[in-house]
Amino acid sequence: MLPSPRPPGSSSRPVDLAVSLGRLRLRNPVLVASGTFGYGREMTGFVELGQLGGIVPKTITPLPRQGNVPWRTVETAAGLLNSIGLDNDGIDAFLRKQLPFLRDCGAPVIVSIAGANQAEFVQLADRLQGVPGVAALELNISCPNVSHGVDLGTDAEMCRSVVAGVRGVTDLPVLAKLTPNVTDIVAIARGAEEGGADAVTLINTCQGMAVDWRRRRPLLGNVVGGLSGPAIKPIALRCVHQVRQKLAIPIVGVGGIMTVDDCMEFFVAGASAVQLGTVNFAEPVASSRILEAIPAALGELGAASLADVVGTLVLPARQPCVDSSETSAHDH
Protein backbone atom coordinates (compact mmCIF):
# COMPACT_ATOMS: atom_id res chain seq x y z
CA MET A 1 0.00 0.00 0.00
CA LEU A 2 1.39 3.41 -0.98
CA PRO A 3 1.96 6.10 1.66
CA SER A 4 -0.66 8.87 1.76
CA PRO A 5 0.55 12.07 0.06
CA ARG A 6 0.87 15.27 2.08
CA PRO A 7 0.70 18.83 0.76
CA PRO A 8 4.01 20.39 -0.31
CA GLY A 9 5.67 22.20 2.55
CA SER A 10 3.81 20.29 5.26
CA SER A 11 5.76 19.30 8.36
CA SER A 12 7.10 15.79 8.47
CA ARG A 13 8.91 13.49 10.86
CA PRO A 14 12.55 12.54 10.18
CA VAL A 15 12.93 10.44 7.05
CA ASP A 16 15.24 7.43 6.84
CA LEU A 17 17.49 7.89 3.79
CA ALA A 18 19.64 4.78 4.32
CA VAL A 19 20.27 2.62 1.26
CA SER A 20 21.24 -1.03 0.82
CA LEU A 21 22.84 -2.03 -2.48
CA GLY A 22 23.37 -5.69 -1.85
CA ARG A 23 26.14 -5.77 0.77
CA LEU A 24 26.91 -2.06 0.37
CA ARG A 25 25.25 0.16 2.98
CA LEU A 26 25.05 3.91 2.38
CA ARG A 27 23.77 6.64 4.70
CA ASN A 28 21.85 8.33 1.89
CA PRO A 29 21.11 7.79 -1.82
CA VAL A 30 23.02 10.72 -3.36
CA LEU A 31 26.29 9.72 -5.01
CA VAL A 32 28.45 11.55 -7.53
CA ALA A 33 29.25 9.86 -10.83
CA SER A 34 32.64 8.84 -12.12
CA GLY A 35 34.28 11.34 -14.44
CA THR A 36 32.26 14.32 -13.20
CA PHE A 37 33.75 14.91 -9.76
CA GLY A 38 37.46 14.37 -10.33
CA TYR A 39 38.99 12.58 -7.35
CA GLY A 40 36.98 14.63 -4.87
CA ARG A 41 39.80 17.02 -4.04
CA GLU A 42 38.70 19.36 -6.83
CA MET A 43 35.23 19.80 -5.27
CA THR A 44 36.13 20.50 -1.64
CA GLY A 45 35.43 24.21 -2.07
CA PHE A 46 31.85 23.49 -3.11
CA VAL A 47 30.63 20.38 -1.29
CA GLU A 48 31.11 18.87 2.14
CA LEU A 49 32.26 15.50 0.86
CA GLY A 50 31.40 13.66 4.05
CA GLN A 51 27.69 14.34 3.61
CA LEU A 52 27.50 12.43 0.32
CA GLY A 53 26.12 8.92 0.10
CA GLY A 54 29.20 7.95 -1.88
CA ILE A 55 31.89 9.16 -4.26
CA VAL A 56 32.73 7.35 -7.49
CA PRO A 57 36.04 8.88 -8.57
CA LYS A 58 37.37 9.00 -12.10
CA THR A 59 37.79 5.56 -13.69
CA ILE A 60 41.20 3.94 -13.31
CA THR A 61 42.93 1.40 -15.55
CA PRO A 62 45.89 -0.94 -14.93
CA LEU A 63 48.35 1.39 -16.67
CA PRO A 64 48.29 5.14 -17.38
CA ARG A 65 46.20 6.23 -20.39
CA GLN A 66 46.57 9.48 -22.30
CA GLY A 67 43.01 9.38 -23.57
CA ASN A 68 41.64 10.64 -26.85
CA VAL A 69 42.81 13.54 -28.98
CA PRO A 70 41.03 16.91 -28.54
CA TRP A 71 38.47 18.23 -28.76
CA ARG A 72 37.15 16.04 -25.97
CA THR A 73 33.96 17.81 -24.90
CA VAL A 74 31.19 19.61 -26.74
CA GLU A 75 28.18 21.24 -25.13
CA THR A 76 24.86 20.33 -26.74
CA ALA A 77 21.38 21.82 -26.56
CA ALA A 78 20.42 19.58 -23.63
CA GLY A 79 23.62 18.05 -22.33
CA LEU A 80 27.26 17.32 -22.98
CA LEU A 81 29.17 15.15 -25.42
CA ASN A 82 32.47 13.80 -24.17
CA SER A 83 35.20 11.63 -25.60
CA ILE A 84 37.80 11.59 -22.84
CA GLY A 85 39.07 8.10 -23.53
CA LEU A 86 39.62 7.06 -19.89
CA ASP A 87 42.52 9.47 -19.45
CA ASN A 88 44.04 8.56 -16.07
CA ASP A 89 47.36 7.90 -14.33
CA GLY A 90 46.74 4.20 -13.66
CA ILE A 91 46.09 2.25 -10.48
CA ASP A 92 49.54 2.72 -8.92
CA ALA A 93 49.25 6.51 -9.04
CA PHE A 94 45.65 6.31 -7.79
CA LEU A 95 46.64 4.30 -4.74
CA ARG A 96 49.58 6.59 -4.02
CA LYS A 97 48.17 10.04 -4.82
CA GLN A 98 44.38 9.97 -4.71
CA LEU A 99 43.12 7.29 -2.36
CA PRO A 100 44.71 8.72 0.83
CA PHE A 101 42.66 11.91 0.40
CA LEU A 102 39.49 10.04 -0.53
CA ARG A 103 39.90 7.70 2.42
CA ASP A 104 39.76 10.67 4.79
CA CYS A 105 36.89 12.55 3.12
CA GLY A 106 34.16 10.84 5.14
CA ALA A 107 32.13 9.38 2.27
CA PRO A 108 32.23 5.78 1.02
CA VAL A 109 34.59 5.47 -1.95
CA ILE A 110 33.33 3.31 -4.81
CA VAL A 111 36.32 2.84 -7.10
CA SER A 112 35.50 2.80 -10.82
CA ILE A 113 37.68 0.38 -12.78
CA ALA A 114 37.98 -0.39 -16.48
CA GLY A 115 39.95 -2.96 -18.41
CA ALA A 116 40.43 -3.81 -22.06
CA ASN A 117 39.39 -7.39 -21.28
CA GLN A 118 38.25 -9.59 -18.43
CA ALA A 119 41.78 -10.29 -17.25
CA GLU A 120 42.43 -6.58 -16.65
CA PHE A 121 39.20 -6.17 -14.66
CA VAL A 122 40.21 -9.12 -12.51
CA GLN A 123 43.72 -7.73 -12.10
CA LEU A 124 42.37 -4.39 -10.87
CA ALA A 125 39.86 -5.97 -8.52
CA ASP A 126 42.57 -8.18 -7.05
CA ARG A 127 44.81 -5.15 -6.44
CA LEU A 128 42.01 -3.31 -4.63
CA GLN A 129 40.91 -6.24 -2.47
CA GLY A 130 41.57 -5.43 1.16
CA VAL A 131 42.84 -1.90 0.48
CA PRO A 132 41.71 0.38 3.34
CA GLY A 133 39.26 3.07 2.23
CA VAL A 134 37.75 1.18 -0.70
CA ALA A 135 34.05 0.56 0.03
CA ALA A 136 33.08 -1.03 -3.29
CA LEU A 137 33.96 -1.38 -6.96
CA GLU A 138 32.05 -0.07 -9.97
CA LEU A 139 32.86 -1.92 -13.18
CA ASN A 140 32.89 0.37 -16.21
CA ILE A 141 32.17 -2.36 -18.73
CA SER A 142 31.57 -0.13 -21.73
CA CYS A 143 35.16 -0.20 -22.94
CA PRO A 144 36.42 -2.12 -26.02
CA ASN A 145 37.29 -5.78 -25.64
CA VAL A 146 40.63 -6.10 -27.37
CA SER A 147 40.31 -9.84 -27.80
CA HIS A 148 36.92 -9.91 -29.46
CA GLY A 149 36.47 -6.46 -30.95
CA VAL A 150 33.15 -5.77 -29.19
CA ASP A 151 32.11 -3.95 -26.05
CA LEU A 152 32.01 -6.16 -22.99
CA GLY A 153 28.88 -4.37 -21.85
CA THR A 154 26.85 -5.13 -24.97
CA ASP A 155 26.96 -8.91 -24.60
CA ALA A 156 25.10 -10.52 -21.69
CA GLU A 157 27.41 -13.52 -21.42
CA MET A 158 30.56 -11.37 -21.50
CA CYS A 159 29.04 -9.13 -18.86
CA ARG A 160 28.27 -12.15 -16.67
CA SER A 161 31.77 -13.50 -17.18
CA VAL A 162 33.52 -10.23 -16.27
CA VAL A 163 31.43 -9.76 -13.13
CA ALA A 164 31.96 -13.39 -12.12
CA GLY A 165 35.71 -13.06 -12.68
CA VAL A 166 35.84 -10.00 -10.44
CA ARG A 167 33.60 -11.66 -7.89
CA GLY A 168 36.07 -14.53 -7.73
CA VAL A 169 38.93 -12.37 -6.45
CA THR A 170 37.22 -9.89 -4.14
CA ASP A 171 34.64 -9.77 -1.40
CA LEU A 172 34.03 -6.05 -2.00
CA PRO A 173 30.53 -5.09 -3.14
CA VAL A 174 30.44 -4.90 -6.94
CA LEU A 175 28.35 -2.54 -9.06
CA ALA A 176 28.19 -3.04 -12.83
CA LYS A 177 27.74 0.19 -14.80
CA LEU A 178 25.87 -0.66 -17.98
CA THR A 179 25.66 1.00 -21.37
CA PRO A 180 22.25 1.94 -22.83
CA ASN A 181 23.57 1.29 -26.33
CA VAL A 182 22.02 -2.17 -26.49
CA THR A 183 18.77 -3.68 -27.73
CA ASP A 184 17.88 -5.39 -24.44
CA ILE A 185 19.11 -3.73 -21.24
CA VAL A 186 17.36 -6.35 -19.11
CA ALA A 187 19.42 -9.15 -20.66
CA ILE A 188 22.67 -7.33 -19.87
CA ALA A 189 21.54 -6.56 -16.31
CA ARG A 190 20.57 -10.19 -15.86
CA GLY A 191 24.08 -11.17 -16.91
CA ALA A 192 25.51 -8.86 -14.25
CA GLU A 193 23.14 -10.27 -11.63
CA GLU A 194 24.00 -13.86 -12.53
CA GLY A 195 27.70 -12.98 -12.35
CA GLY A 196 27.29 -11.89 -8.74
CA ALA A 197 26.93 -8.09 -8.94
CA ASP A 198 25.45 -6.42 -5.86
CA ALA A 199 23.82 -3.71 -7.99
CA VAL A 200 23.71 -2.26 -11.48
CA THR A 201 24.31 1.38 -12.35
CA LEU A 202 21.95 2.56 -15.09
CA ILE A 203 23.05 4.17 -17.34
CA ASN A 204 26.34 5.13 -18.89
CA THR A 205 26.31 7.69 -21.72
CA CYS A 206 24.48 7.35 -25.03
CA GLN A 207 26.52 7.45 -28.22
CA GLY A 208 26.30 10.69 -30.16
CA MET A 209 28.21 13.21 -32.23
CA ALA A 210 28.28 16.88 -33.17
CA VAL A 211 29.14 18.45 -36.53
CA ASP A 212 30.44 21.83 -37.69
CA TRP A 213 28.60 21.96 -41.00
CA ARG A 214 30.44 25.04 -42.27
CA ARG A 215 33.80 23.35 -41.88
CA ARG A 216 32.30 19.95 -42.62
CA ARG A 217 34.13 18.52 -39.65
CA PRO A 218 33.14 16.60 -36.50
CA LEU A 219 33.48 18.67 -33.35
CA LEU A 220 35.00 15.84 -31.33
CA GLY A 221 38.51 14.65 -32.11
CA ASN A 222 37.28 11.07 -31.77
CA VAL A 223 34.25 11.89 -34.00
CA VAL A 224 31.74 10.17 -31.69
CA GLY A 225 31.35 10.50 -27.94
CA GLY A 226 29.07 9.87 -25.02
CA LEU A 227 26.02 12.07 -24.53
CA SER A 228 25.05 12.90 -20.95
CA GLY A 229 22.79 15.42 -19.25
CA PRO A 230 19.03 16.10 -19.38
CA ALA A 231 18.71 14.78 -22.94
CA ILE A 232 19.24 11.20 -21.78
CA LYS A 233 17.06 11.21 -18.66
CA PRO A 234 14.04 9.62 -20.39
CA ILE A 235 16.30 6.83 -21.68
CA ALA A 236 17.79 6.28 -18.23
CA LEU A 237 14.34 6.18 -16.62
CA ARG A 238 13.17 3.66 -19.18
CA CYS A 239 16.15 1.42 -18.48
CA VAL A 240 15.65 1.64 -14.71
CA HIS A 241 11.96 0.82 -15.08
CA GLN A 242 12.53 -2.13 -17.39
CA VAL A 243 15.18 -3.70 -15.18
CA ARG A 244 13.13 -3.11 -12.03
CA GLN A 245 10.14 -4.86 -13.59
CA LYS A 246 12.10 -8.01 -14.42
CA LEU A 247 14.95 -8.34 -11.89
CA ALA A 248 15.49 -8.10 -8.15
CA ILE A 249 19.00 -6.62 -8.29
CA PRO A 250 19.27 -3.12 -6.73
CA ILE A 251 19.64 -0.22 -9.17
CA VAL A 252 21.62 3.02 -9.04
CA GLY A 253 20.02 5.50 -11.44
CA VAL A 254 22.10 8.02 -13.36
CA GLY A 255 21.48 10.15 -16.41
CA GLY A 256 20.33 13.76 -16.63
CA ILE A 257 19.56 14.31 -12.96
CA MET A 258 19.50 18.06 -12.26
CA THR A 259 16.84 18.49 -9.54
CA VAL A 260 15.25 16.71 -6.60
CA ASP A 261 12.24 16.02 -8.83
CA ASP A 262 14.53 14.11 -11.19
CA CYS A 263 15.78 12.04 -8.25
CA MET A 264 12.25 11.26 -7.14
CA GLU A 265 11.36 10.09 -10.64
CA PHE A 266 14.24 7.62 -10.53
CA PHE A 267 13.27 6.39 -7.06
CA VAL A 268 9.65 5.80 -8.03
CA ALA A 269 10.78 4.08 -11.26
CA GLY A 270 12.88 1.64 -9.24
CA ALA A 271 16.30 3.10 -8.39
CA SER A 272 17.46 2.69 -4.78
CA ALA A 273 20.11 5.40 -5.19
CA VAL A 274 21.19 7.96 -7.77
CA GLN A 275 24.41 9.39 -9.14
CA LEU A 276 24.76 13.03 -10.14
CA GLY A 277 26.94 13.57 -13.18
CA THR A 278 26.84 16.38 -15.72
CA VAL A 279 25.09 18.70 -13.27
CA ASN A 280 28.35 18.86 -11.30
CA PHE A 281 29.95 20.80 -14.16
CA ALA A 282 27.10 23.32 -14.36
CA GLU A 283 26.46 23.59 -10.62
CA PRO A 284 29.20 22.19 -8.38
CA VAL A 285 26.99 22.52 -5.27
CA ALA A 286 24.12 20.54 -6.82
CA SER A 287 24.67 17.40 -4.75
CA SER A 288 24.24 19.35 -1.49
CA ARG A 289 21.17 21.17 -2.78
CA ILE A 290 19.48 17.98 -3.96
CA LEU A 291 20.34 15.95 -0.87
CA GLU A 292 18.84 18.62 1.39
CA ALA A 293 15.60 18.60 -0.61
CA ILE A 294 14.96 14.83 -0.62
CA PRO A 295 13.40 14.54 2.88
CA ALA A 296 10.75 17.14 2.04
CA ALA A 297 10.00 15.45 -1.28
CA LEU A 298 9.59 12.10 0.46
CA GLY A 299 7.42 13.84 3.04
CA GLU A 300 5.05 14.95 0.28
CA LEU A 301 4.39 11.27 -0.37
CA GLY A 302 3.90 10.51 3.31
CA ALA A 303 6.97 8.28 3.28
CA ALA A 304 8.87 7.49 6.47
CA SER A 305 11.84 6.15 4.51
CA LEU A 306 13.31 6.20 1.05
CA ALA A 307 12.57 2.48 0.77
CA ASP A 308 8.85 3.28 1.01
CA VAL A 309 8.85 4.87 -2.45
CA VAL A 310 11.46 2.90 -4.40
CA GLY A 311 9.78 1.04 -7.26
CA THR A 312 6.26 2.25 -6.45
CA LEU A 313 5.43 3.37 -9.98
CA VAL A 314 1.72 2.76 -10.64
CA LEU A 315 1.28 1.43 -14.16
CA PRO A 316 -1.93 1.94 -16.15
CA ALA A 317 -4.23 -1.04 -16.47
CA ARG A 318 -3.70 -2.88 -19.73
CA GLN A 319 -6.56 -2.27 -22.13
CA PRO A 320 -7.90 -5.08 -24.32
CA CYS A 321 -6.83 -4.87 -27.95
CA VAL A 322 -9.47 -3.55 -30.33
CA ASP A 323 -9.69 -4.75 -33.92
CA SER A 324 -8.23 -2.04 -36.15
CA SER A 325 -11.01 -2.31 -38.72
CA GLU A 326 -13.61 -1.88 -35.97
CA THR A 327 -11.78 1.16 -34.65
CA SER A 328 -11.61 2.70 -38.11
CA ALA A 329 -15.33 2.21 -38.59
CA HIS A 330 -16.13 4.01 -35.33
CA ASP A 331 -13.77 6.86 -36.20
CA HIS A 332 -15.83 7.92 -39.21
Language model regions located:
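Short low-complexity, flexible loop/linker segments enriched in glycine and/or proline
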Residues: 70-72, 215-218, 289-292
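N-terminal capping/small domains of soluble enzymes
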Residues: 1-109, 115
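Active-site metal-binding loops of divalent metal-dependent hydrolases
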Residues: 35-36, 255-257
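Alpha/beta catalytic cores of nucleotide-metabolism and tRNA/nucleoside-modifying enzymes
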Residues: 1-13, 227-248, 252, 258-332
